[in-house]
UniProtKB/Swiss-Prot annotation:
Keywords: Cell membrane, Membrane, Peptide transport, Protein transport, Transmembrane, Transmembrane helix, Transport
Subunit composition and interactions: The complex is composed of two ATP-binding proteins (OppD and OppF), two transmembrane proteins (OppB and OppC) and a solute-binding protein (OppA).
Name under which the protein is recorded: Oligopeptide transport system permease protein OppC
Topology term for the membrane: Multi-pass membrane protein
Source organism of this protein record: Mycoplasma pneumoniae (strain ATCC 29342 / M129 / Subtype 1) (Mycoplasmoides pneumoniae)
One record GO biological process: transmembrane transport
Length: 376
């Protein structure tokens, strides 16, 4: 090019280098992988919605049983007329709500003597104590119920449904979280050890143990182990037996997940560098390998919660756990034999919301972590 040739300045534009938004000029602490995952997760509107639902359920399960003036096991009144009460709100007077009942005449006479009978008591038959009669009552005119405002009414035992619902949710969530935490800790350590010794006898034996446990149906393991480790000769499982059997069933899930992702990352450059520098195997496992699979394990943990609750509830239907205890299983068992609409609706809807919320949030968390999804 001729040194005397001049450039056409109109083809160029002056810029200030200080205002260029170049990443190589930015000074500051780089964002961590955790922060990036959280950003991607909460860009998903559905993830935010279902996460808030999970938080709301947990808060209600903690607060309602503590704040409620009513018990989750004791009836609000010993009067038989307090059973299967309809919901009542502040704008309803004591006589505004009427209930049609079909019971023995003896109970109808109690309603009449209590002053809550609406209309005339039906005529007696030849055997009045054994004959069912239809009549209407205004139950909230009872002295002990005049100041009672149940959001969902009472069940067939006279227990406040709102309190029972959230006490049952709290009990089932507590069992699920304990089982999930213990399963995660034991399964993660087990899977990390197996994955780091791949190709050796230790990995072969440990992998076969996982396969044997997974080969047998989970409910069969629960029945056999529960029958073996029952305490005091009782016919049904208590909470400690339920927790033990569920941990035995579910620990293989995080163990298998950890082993798979350890195998995928065991030959990466930073692991090889750690070995070259003389790092011990236990340090490589717990300092260098496990942090890589933390995100995947978070997905497994969230997914374990509804799975554990589902199995715990199924034990009541199988007759292996008392139906009189507080818990979602016992609550859903009441639904099968009850015509109480409030009890049926609240039980099914709350269980469905919890199950769907945890599964959708687990899927959203998996999408935020999975690099194959991120690159799409």
């Amino acid at each position: 090019m001729d040194k005397h040739q001049k450039f056409d300045q109109s083809l160029f534009q002056r810029v200030d280098i200080n205002v260029l938004k170049r990443s190589d000029q930015l000074i500051g602490k780089p964002t961590t992988n955790f922060v990036e995952i959280m950003k991607r997760l909460f860009q998903n509107k559905w993830a935010i919605l279902f996460f808030l639902l999970i938080v709301l359920i947990i808060l209600l399960a903690i607060i309602v049983p503590l704040a409620s003036p009513y018990s989750a096991v004791t009836p609000v009144s010993n009067n038989a007329l307090a059973q299967n009460l309809p919901p009542r709100y502040l704008w309803n007077g004591a006589g505004d709500i009427q209930v049609e009942k079909i019971t023995a005449r003896s109970i109808a006479e109690v309603a009449q003597s209590s002053g809550v009978l609406v209309g005339k008591l039906p005529e007696a038959s030849s055997n009045p104590l054994a004959t069912n009669v239809k009549y209407n009552i205004a139950p909230y005119q009872l002295a002990e119920l005049k100041n009672y405002y149940p959001l969902l009414g009472t069940n067939g035992l006279g227990v406040d449904i709102w309190t029972l619902l959230w006490a049952s949710m709290a009990k089932s969530l507590w069992i699920a979280i304990v089982v999930a935490l213990v399963s995660m800790v034991f399964g993660t350590i087990y899977g990390a050890i197996a994955g780091s010794f791949v190709g050796r006898a230790a990995d072969n034996i440990m992998s076969r143990i996982i396969e044997i446990i997974d080969l047998v149906p989970s409910i069969l393991w629960i029945i056999v182990l529960g029958a073996t480790f029952r305490f005091g000769g009782v016919k049904q499982f208590d909470d400690s037996v339920v927790i033990f059997t569920l941990i035995f069933v579910f620990w293989t899930w995080p163990a298998a997940t950890t082993r798979i992702y350890i195998l995928k990352n065991k030959d990466t450059e930073y692991i090889q560098a750690a070995r070259t520098l003389g790092a011990k195997q236990i340090r490589i496992i717990f300092v260098h390998m496990l942090p890589v699979v933390t995100g995947r394990l978070a997905v497994v943990f969230v997914s374990l919660i509804p799975a554990v609750i589902g199995y715990e509830a199924s034990l009541v239907f199988l007759g292996l756990k008392p139906a009189t205890e507080v818990g979602l299983g016992a609550l859903l068992n009441q639904v099968t034999s009850s015509g109480n609409i409030a009890l049926i609706t609240s039980s099914i809807v709350s269980f469905a919301i919890l199950t769907v919320s945890t599964r959708v949030f687990a899927n959203a968390l998996n999408d935020a972590i999975d690099p194959r999804v991120i690159r799409r």
